[in-house]
């Protein structure tokens, strides 16, 4: 039997820099750590990826929490308003 993955909403995309493939994420709930798996969903967006790189004010960070606004390296194009979910095993 396939177990469905549990997802927790952690934030939303507020901006996207296409040239450098970075989405700006406002963390609205919970936390994210480098190595976590996330699912980004929106009207034209739906993909999963591992969190490989996060920055706050151009400084590399390992963990972020509610209230932080971060730059997140993304593997596909994202749009403002897309929701970011952390996949919980």
Which residue stretches match the model-derived regions?
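Beta-strand/loop-dominated core regions that host nucleotide or nucleotide-derived cofactor-binding catalytic loops
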Residues: 2-32, 36-89
């Amino acid at each position: 039997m396939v177990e469905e993955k549990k997802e927790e909403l952690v934030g939303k995309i507020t901006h996207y820099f296409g040239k450098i493939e970075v989405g700006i994420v406002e963390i609205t709930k919970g936390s994210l750590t480098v190595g976590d798996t996330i699912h980004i969903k929106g009207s034209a967006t739906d993909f999963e990826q591992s969190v490989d790189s996060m920055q706050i004010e151009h400084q590399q960070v390992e963990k972020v929490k509610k209230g932080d606004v971060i730059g997140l390296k993304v593997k596909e194009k994202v749009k403002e308003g897309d929701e970011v979910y952390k996949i919980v095993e």
